[in-house]
Amino acid sequence: MKTALLSVSDKTGIVEFARGLVKADFRIISTGGTKKVLEEAGLSIVSVEAITNFPEMLDGRVKTLHPAIHGGLLARRDLPEHLAALKEHNIDLIDLVCVNLYPFKSTIMQNGVTEAEAIEQIDIGGPSMLRSAAKNFASVLPVVDPKDYQPVLAALAHQTDNVKFRRALALKVFQHTAAYDTLIAQYLGQNGEIFPDELTKTYTKKQVMRYGENSHQKAAFYEDALPVPFSIAQAQQLHGKELSYNNIKDADAALKMSAEFNQPAVVAVKHMNPCGIGLGQNIEEAWDRAYEADSMSIFGGIIVLNRPVDLATAEKMHKLFLEIIIAPSFEKEAFTVLAQKKNLRIMTVDFNQHQDAKELETVSVMGGLLVQEQDAVVETATDFKVVSKRQPTESELKAMVFGQTVVKHVKSNAIVITTDQQTLGIGAGQMNRIGSVEIAVKQAEGSANFKNAVMASDAFFPMEDCVEYAAKHGIKAIVEPGGSIKDQASIDKADELGISLIFSGRRHFRH
C-alpha cells in the first residue's frame, strides 16, 4: 500500500480526491482541519502525530517539520542506502503529497490586517513538504493545485504517472512556492529599499491573448499579485470584445494621463500617445474639447473620462468608431447607447484609488531590467523661470502648466501646443526636435483657439530654430526645461521676436 499526505487550506475537492486515492490503494496521512474534514466524510485517516510520534506545538507552527515526514519524502527509491536508513529509523515512504498553502494573499488584501496577523499566515511546513516532494518527483507525486486532482487520479488509474507528468507537477510546485515567497517579500518590502539588491515580483496570468503586438507574436497578460486598484488590470469590463495586447498598452497610457487632472477631463490615446486631451466644467465639455483637438486621429482611439458618463456625452461618442471607453461609471441610458456597438469595450475603473498607483516602471532589455520611479512630478507656475523680456500672461501661464502636464506623456522628442483647456497640436517621436515642432504647429494652426496657444517641450532646444519657427507661426509663449549650451541663443531669439520663453528646469524624456 502506498501513502499520501494531505494538508490543505483550500478544501475544495479534497474529499473526492482522497476517496480516489483510497480507491487507488493509498492510505491517507493528514493534519488538523484537513483530517477533520476527511474523517467527517467517512474516510479512515492516520494523523501526522501517529507518524512522527510528536505532537503539534507552538499553536500549530510545528506539525510536519520532522524527519519522519521529510525522510519519507526525500528518500531515493533507487539508492539502497537511503532505503536502509529509513528502515533503521522506522520511517515509511510517502508517495504523494497534496498541499496548498496558508492564504497569505487573501489575508493581506483585507482592510485593517496587521503585520502580525499577516505573518501568522506565512506557511512554513507546507512549502517544505512541497519542495521535498518536488525535488524527489521521480518517486513522489507533488500536488499543489486542486485543478490537478482529477489528472493525478486518472494518471494513477491508467499508470501514466510517468517522469514527464511528474516533472510538470514539480515545476508547478516550484513556481507556486517561488511566487508565494516572492509575495511575502513584496509585502514586507513595501516600505523598504526602493531598489533592493535582489528584485523579485510575482504575477498571475490573467489572460492569454489571440496574439501580441502583431499577429505573428504570442502574448499573455499577467497581473501583479498585489493588485493595483487604479489600473487596467483591475478594470471591470462591462461590454465588448476581449482586450488585445495593444489595447492594454494604450489603455494603461491613457489611464496614467487621466490621473493628472482633478477637473473633468477626457483623454484620447492612439499608439501610446495622446491625440487629444480636453478639460471642462463638465464631462461633456471636456469630451468636446478632446474631440476637437484632433477629430481625425481620435478615430479608433482609446478614451478615458475621469467623471461618470452621461447620456449627452455617450450620444456624441456613439457617433465615432472607438476601441475602448473607460470611466468611473456610466449612467444607465448612456451605457445603453454605447452598448449598441457590440465590439466596443466599455470599462470602469475606481478613480478614487489613483493616488495609490505609484508602481515602479520597468523596461525589459536584453539580459536585464531597467527600473525607475514614475515621472509623477506635478509642476506649477511657481516652478517656472521667465528668461525672456516679455512676461507671459496669466492665461499663458495656465496653458503652459497644462502643456507641461501633457508633454511628459508624449514620446520624445515631444512638443505640445495647448490652451489651458485643450491640446491643439502634438508632435511626437521625431528624431530631431524641430521636426516635432513642425508637426505640432501644422496640426494646431487650423484651430480657432490657436491665437491663445502656447508651446511646451519635453527637453531643451539645442538651437534657436524651434523658437523661431514657433514664433513665426503665431506662438506667443514657450516653456522648455533649459539646460542647453545654446540656451542664450534661444533666449535672444525669443526677445528678438517678442515672445515669452520660460525655463521649467525639469526634463520629461519619454522613450
Swiss-Prot record:
One MF annotation (Gene Ontology) recorded for this entry: IMP cyclohydrolase activity
GO cellular component, one term: cytosol
Keyword Transferase on entry: yes
EC number: 2.1.2.3, 3.5.4.10
UniProt superkingdom: Bacteria
GO biological process, one term: 'de novo' IMP biosynthetic process
Keyword field contains Transcription regulation: no
NCBIfam families to which the protein is assigned, alphabetical: PRK00881.1 (NF002049), purH (TIGR00355)
PANTHER family per UniProt: BIFUNCTIONAL PURINE BIOSYNTHESIS PROTEIN ATIC, BIFUNCTIONAL PURINE BIOSYNTHESIS PROTEIN PURH
Comment block on domains: The IMP cyclohydrolase activity resides in the N-terminal region.
Protein name: Bifunctional purine biosynthesis protein PurH
Organism: Pediococcus pentosaceus (strain ATCC 25745 / CCUG 21536 / LMG 10740 / 183-1w)
